[in-house]
Structures are given as C-alpha cells and as structure tokens.
UniProtKB/Swiss-Prot annotation:
Its EC number is 3.1.-.-, 3.6.4.-. Homodimer. Binds to stalled ribosomes, contacting rRNA. ATP binds at G344, P345, N346, T347, G348, G349, K350, T351. Belongs to the DNA mismatch repair MutS family. MutS2 subfamily. SMART domains: MUTSac, MUTSd, SMR. Endonuclease that is involved in the suppression of homologous recombination and thus may have a key role in the control of bacterial genetic diversity. Acts as a ribosome collision sensor, splitting the ribosome into its 2 subunits. Detects stalled/collided 70S ribosomes which it binds and splits by an ATP-hydrolysis driven conformational change. Acts upstream of the ribosome quality control system (RQC), a ribosome-associated complex that mediates the extraction of incompletely synthesized nascent chains from stalled ribosomes and their subsequent degradation. Probably generates substrates for RQC. GO terms for molecular function: ATP binding; ATP hydrolysis activity; ATP-dependent DNA damage sensor activity; endonuclease activity; mismatched DNA binding; ribosomal large subunit binding; rRNA binding. GO terms for biological process: mismatch repair; negative regulation of DNA recombination; rescue of stalled ribosome. This is Endonuclease MutS2. Pfam families: MutS_V (PF00488), Smr (PF01713). Keywords: ATP-binding, DNA-binding, Endonuclease, Hydrolase, Nuclease, Nucleotide-binding, RNA-binding, rRNA-binding. SUPFAM superfamilies: DNA repair protein MutS, domain III (SSF48334), P-loop containing nucleoside triphosphate hydrolases (SSF52540), SMR domain-like (SSF160443). It comes from Thermomicrobium roseum (strain ATCC 27502 / DSM 5159 / P-2).
Length: 792
C-alpha cells in the first residue's frame, strides 16, 4: 500500500513500536519494513504466526532467540575473498550456536512441530552446519582469539614460542644482575619489537650490544645485548611463524564461511523472522490486543461482482493512545449499512475514530493483533483510501480544499466495493452550502460504488441525508454539556448535536443574546436537537436494557448448565439403581434355576435324601418365587403407573425428568421439581418412569438424592490484584464453583506482564479440584483469560 496512506494513518509509528520490541538487529530492520498485504491467505498466515508466538511466550515467558548476530556483511566479505578477522569469524560461530540452541529448545518438546507449525518452519530453516560450527569453535575463542587447538602446527609453534620467550627473559634478568653498575633501572622492555635493557649512557661500553632507542634526557640507552641477539632472533622468527599460521587458518575458515554463505544468510533471515514474530506477540501483550477475526464477505454483490466486505470492532482503541485513558469505540460496517457519517464538535474524537478503524485494518493485514475486545474482526481490503487533516501541497501551491479534492477525485476513480474509504471533514474548506451539496453527491457516488467507509463532517444537511438513505448511518461523538468537554464515546445511530448555545450560556454569554440566537436559528434546528436528545436518551435506555438482558442471559446459561448437570446426575443414579435391581433379580433367578435342578436330580437319584432336600429346596424356591413375583408386580405397576409424591416422572411435552413434589387433584395437575425449579403440568402429560424412593428401597435400589446448588458466577476477575490475594480468592472461588456443580469457569487475569497469569497457571497445575485448564480462544479473551475445567 502507498507510503502516504501508511503515514496518514500513522502506521510508521506502529513499525517503530514493533522494532523496539525486537531483540535482533535484523528483525528490527524487518519490523521497519513490514507492510499490510491484500492477500487474504497471507494475512491468515501472518496472524497464525503471531498467535503461535504469543502462545510460546505465554508458556515460556523468558524465551529469546539468544545470541544471533548480524553476519550478513561478514558473509559477503568472505564471498569477496577478504580474509576475515577472528572477531568476525566469532560472530558467525555465535549465530550458529544460537540457531543450534533454538533447535534444541524446540525439539525438547516432542510435539513442537504440531503445536507451533508456523514457528517450526523458521526453526527448520536454520539449517544445521555441525562441521562448520565445530571447526569455528575449535579455532576461535569467546573473546575472538585464535585458539591453540585451531591446528597442530599452531599449537607446536606456540609451545616453542613460549619456551624461547622464557629463555630470552631469563638471560636478560641474569644480565641485569651481572651488570648492575651499568644499568639505569632493573627492568626489561621492548623497542622495535625486540627485548632490550636500560643502560646508563656513561657506562655504554659495559654492555656490548645494539642500541635501539635513547631516552628523552639522553641519560638512558635501550640496548639489545649481543648475548641475547640469537634468542631475540629466535623469538621473532617464531612470532612470524605464528602470524603466518594464523593467517592460513583464517583463510581456510573464511573459505568455509564463503562456501556456506547461502545457508548462513538463510539462518539470519529465519532468526529475524522468528524474532519479528516474538516482537509482534510482545506488542500484543503491551497493547492488550487480540487476534482479529478475518470476516468473510457477506450480503449481495454490486454490479461489478465485488463482494461486500465488513468491519466489526468492539471496544476498539487507537494503539498510539494511552490505553488507561483512551475511550474504546464500537464500529460495525457492511451489515446494516455501508458508510458511517460521524458528526460532532471539534476535538471530540471524530478523526480519532476514523483513524482507529483505518489503522486497525492496516495492523490486521500486517499480521498484528489489534487493541480491541474479543470478537472483533475485519475483512481484508485490497485498497484503503484516506483523506485526513488539512495538509496542503506546497509544491503544487494548492489550497486546502483543492488538496482534499485531489484525493477524493483519485478515490472515486479507483475505489470499488472491496475498498475502505475514510474521509475526514468531507468537502470542507469551501462555502458551506456548496460544500454540503458536494459532500452529499460524493456520498451518493460512494454508495453506487459499494465501498465501505467512514466520513466525518460538520454539515448538518448530511445528518438528514444519512437518516433517510439506505446504506448510510449516522453517528456522533458524545459531548458533556456540564463539563463543556467531549467524552469521546462514539454513538452509532445518533447524529451529532450542536452544543454552541449551551457552551455559550455556561461561559456567561447574556441570556438575551442567547435568546436572540435561538430566534435567528428558527424552529427547525432546536426541534432537531430535541429529537436527537430524545434519541440519545432512548439509546441509553436500550443500552442499559441490553446490558441487563446480557447479565440475565449469562445467569440463565449458568442455571441451565447447573440444571443439566443435576438432571444428568439424577439420571445416572436412576440408571445405576435400576441396574442394581436387575442384577439382584438375575441373581435370584439363577438361584431358582439351580434349586430346580437340585430338586430334579434328587427326584431321579436314590443317592440324595429325597424328603429333606426336596422340602428345603421347595421352601427356597417359594422364597425366590415370592421375591420374583414381587418384582414382577412392581414392573406391572410401572407399566400402568399411579403417580404419587416422590415418583420420578417424565414431562412428555418438555422432554425433561423430575421428582413429583405435589399433586393437585382439583386442577388435575402435578407439581414436579427439576433441579432447583418447580413446574406444574397436566397429569396427562406426565409419565411415571421410576418408583418413589420407598419403593426403590424395597427393590434393593439406592435412593436418588437431589442437592440444591448455590448460585456461583462462571467467571472471576483477578486483574490488578497482587499474586497472593489473587490466588487466595481463586482457591475459595474454585471450591464454591465445584460445590455448585460448574463444569468449567473463566479466570480473567489480564495480559499485562504475564506475572499473574504464570502464578495462576502454576497454582492450577497442582490444584485437586482442577481437571485441566487452557487459555481462552483468541476471540474469547485470548492470553488474558484462562478456562479451567473442574472435577465435578
């Protein structure tokens, strides 16, 4: 997208925020180069990468790419044949070791490629070069020094060099002791790369040798004694041999690096891509941002065949404003209307609202999470057109109005139904009557095109036009006449009101002047303001009712879940009781069959005492017969039931089961308890499915108990609490939730630095009432909410 568009919507500042969160210099470069893409598949991929990075940092908060270095110039120098310095070679080794460390970290998790498939691509791109890594590690030390292990020749030279050095120093120390009267000071130093001793100028003949230097006073000569000449020569020769061997080693290592140039540059780019993904995740944490949904096109298509795209932003905030004070806005485009016309006072937030939508669209299409509430989403826009502010084109000597018109002309020529158009103060800077007419004509053309858009204006004529025109919707920024300041709330569905007279009165303008102003306004404007005020009052009432309805819905959902759990538990106990009865009956029948066989054998065989066995068997058989017949009578009663208090029944009209708690003969109704609720149903619509408890106990079945559950909200908020207080509240809450029979709960801890989230996860890991837990989905709170499944 055009750089001018990115600048107007301040996307360049988002780039800087992202670059500041990179740990690798190459990643910082990439952060300053990121741009939105219009390829929907690419946007989905970029968001998936950010999602995986956010999950990785949530699970491993201290994760980092480590010691990656920018080795691009080093590799390129090696390709040109320049012999690399040891310190440069070391940067290559550091990068290879950092890449190897990353591979080990990821592969420590057997399912890493399944859990982080997108990040795994970056890690797999960091090709392992074990041979090169081993050669470099053997040759170059952590401070950039060439090690003795670089080659056997270098090790041998350095051993000889050490011995020669020690012999040389030992001989010089002896000379100092032997020639004390000629020595200026008892020390050894170096001149011209050779060891010398300080000799007094007046005793020069006492120390035969070569003078390499003279002190500033002329009193001291620095002499290389002839006695150490060969030792000095040997030491210098070995130094030269060491230098040649080091140069040879560096030449070999340089060639090895040049040969692996493609792989090394690939490692650099893979490391930068991984660090950039982590930076996007860190930015999401800091902005309290969520992953945006990619909304599919909906609705009819315009003649050109372009689908209608959508915007759905809930509690959206401008990412460059302080999130603690920024007022969130809700904006939806593309469902009920295509273009939102925002009116309101200056500095009231109209431009901020427009910029927020545009900037969040750019962020989403660059793979960034957006500062908004879960459930927010946008379509992918191939083109976004923006005209913001009253900047002038000095080079072309254009007026403010002309500058705006040039942008609008380009927009109308290029935009289509897949475009997002954002026009700030449409057609401003000219005669108000002509400007209003021009603005209306532009809006009509945008509707014909089918573009999605937001337009801000001061023209009151556009309020009326938007009210009665399909595809347009009014919106305003709220103004507090008491404080004489905007609240920055965006009120969709309400055109903006004029507050000039209220402000003037509160500032002390004489009442007669205000009254005269009202006369000059005529009746239309005040009536419109009163109508808008009434609409605002009704909107606030509707919002209050909607909030109450949402609370009731959540409570009802909680009660429904609890009732379902209770009914399921009762049904399970009923099935278990019935199975127990059947097992008892089967055992009795088996016993009866065995007794019958014993009687039959006794009757045929004289070996059995016929009278005694037969009488005992008959008595046992009679007992079994009595118990089985009793069970049979019970079964027949179930088939033709007479309903009584305590019976387990099914409400055939509702498909629910419950226990009879009262019978009302006068109305022929039965009162049934289902969980905590009681309902009355006609007796004809109730079917007895299980005997009352006294009868169950007679047929060996345990009673089915129903416990009243306490009401517990399915969500607890711990944001802003200290860890110790939060864990104490959470522990007590989990106990209540389990006793209430909640299968799961939501723990809202916020994102922040992640400290509270980590402490909560550690606490849940060993909690006896917790079956499992997981982070909420990206559209249900993401990293700021943990869903806990309970042992119920």
């Amino acid at each position: 997208m055009a750089s001018e568009l990115l600048r107007l919507l301040e996307f360049d500042k988002i780039r800087e925020l992202l670059a500041a969160r990179c740990q690798y210099s190459v990643a910082s470069e990439r952060a300053r180069e990121i741009a939105p893409t219009a390829d929907r598949d690419q946007v989905a991929y970029l968001l998936r990468v950010t999602r995986e990075a956010a999950r990785l940092l949530n699970e491993r908060p201290s994760f980092t790419i480590g010691g990656f270095r920018d080795i691009r110039s080093v590799v390129q120098a090696a390709q040109r044949g320049n012999i690399l310095a040891p310190a440069d070679v070391r940067t290559v080794l550091d990068t290879l070791e950092a890449a190897a460390s990353l591979r080990r970290q990821f592969m420590a998790d057997e399912r890493w490629s399944e859990r982080y498939p997108a990040l795994a691509e970056f890690v797999l791109a960091m090709v392992d070069l074990p041979g090169l890594r081993a050669d470099l590690a053997r040759s170059i030390g952590p401070r950039g020094e060439v090690l003795d292990t670089a080659s056997p020749e270098l090790a041998a030279i350095r051993r000889s060099l050490k011995e020669a050095h020690e012999r040389l120093l030992e001989r010089l120390r002896r000379l100092l002791a032997e020639r004390q009267e000629a020595i200026q000071d008892a020390y050894v130093t170096i001149r011209d790369g050779r060891y010398v001793i300080p000799v007094r100028a007046d005793r020069r003949q006492a120390v035969p040798g070569i003078t390499h230097d003279v002190s500033g006073s002329g009193q001291t000569l620095f002499v290389e004694p002839f006695e150490v000449l060969e030792l000095n020569n040997r030491w210098r020769e070995l130094q030269a041999a060491e230098t040649r061997e080091i140069e040879r080693i560096l030449r070999v290592l340089t060639q090895r690096i040049a040969d692996a140039a493609d792989e090394l540059l690939q490692i650099v780019e893979a490391g930068a891509a991984l660090d950039l993904a982590l930076a996007k995740a860190r930015l999401a944490y800091d902005l309290d941002a969520v992953e945006p949904e990619l909304l599919e096109p909906s609705g009819p298509t315009v003649p050109e065949g372009h689908p209608f795209l959508r915007v759905r932003l809930r509690a959206a905030r401008h990412p460059l404003l302080d999130r603690r004070t920024a007022v969130p806005i809700d904006v939806e485009l593309g469902e009920r209307f295509r273009i939102l016309v925002i009116t309101g006072p200056n500095t009231g937030g109209k431009t901020v609202a427009l910029k927020t939508v545009g900037l969040l669209a750019l962020m989403a299409q660059a793979g960034l999470f957006i500062p908004a509430a879960p459930g927010s989403g946008l379509s992918v826009f191939p083109a976004i057109f923006v005209d913001i502010g009253d900047e002038q084109s000095i080079e072309q000597n254009l007026s403010t109005f002309s500058s705006h018109m040039r942008r609008i002309v380009a927009t109308l020529q290029q935009a289509d139904a897949s475009s997002l158009v954002l026009l700030d103060e449409i057609a401003a800077g000219t005669d108000p009557q002509e400007g209003a007419a021009l603005a209306r004509a532009i809006l009509e053309r945008l509707l014909e095109i089918g573009a999605l858009g937001i337009v801000t204006t001061h023209y009151p004529e556009l309020k009326v036009f938007a009210t009665g025109t399909p595809g347009l919707e009014n919106a305003s920024v709220e103004f507090d006449p008491v404080t004489l300041s905007p609240t920055y709330r965006l009120l969709v569905g309400l055109p903006g009101r004029s507050h000039a007279l209220e402000v003037a009165r509160r500032l002390g303008l004489p009442e007669d002047v205000i009254a005269r102003a009202r006369e000059l306004l005529g009746s239309g404007a005040p009536q419109l303001d009163r109508l808008i005020a009434e609409m605002q009052r009704r909107l606030e009432e509707a919002e209050s009712l909607a909030a109450a309805a949402e609370r009731s819905r959540r409570e009802a959902e909680q009660l429904r879940a609890a009732a379902e759990r209770l009914l399921a538990e009762a049904e399970r106990e009923r099935r278990e009781a019935r199975q127990e009865v059947l097992r008892e009956l089967e055992a009795e029948l088996a016993r009866a069959r065995e007794l019958a066989r014993k009687i039959e054998r006794a009757a045929r065989s004289p070996a059995y005492p016929p009278i005694e066995v037969t009488q005992d068997s008959l008595r046992a058989l009679e007992e079994v017969k009595r118990r089985v017949q009793s069970s049979g009578r019970q079964s027949r009663q179930e088939r033709v039931p007479e309903i009584a208090v305590g019976d387990r029944v099914e409400l055939t009209a509702l498909g629910l089961e419950g226990d009879v708690v009262a019978i009302h003969p006068e109305s022929e109704e039965v009162e049934v308890r289902i969980g905590q609720f009681r309902v009355r149903q006609p007796q004809a619509s109730v079917r007895r499915i299980w005997p009352r408890r006294e009868e169950v106990s007679q047929t060996f079945a345990p009673p089915v108990s129903v416990t009243t559950i306490p009401r517990v909200e399915p969500e607890i908020h711990l944001r802003g609490l200290h860890v110790e207080e939060a864990l104490d509240r959470l522990d007590r809450y989990l106990d209540r939730a389990v006793r209430a029979g909640l299968p799961w709960v939501r723990v809202v801890h916020g994102k922040g630095t992640g400290t509270l989230r980590q402490a909560i996860h550690a606490f849940l890991r060993d909690h006896p009432l917790v079956k499992s837990w997981e982070l909420a989905g990206p559209h249900e709170g993401g990293l700021g909410v943990t869903v806990v499944y309970l042992e119920v």
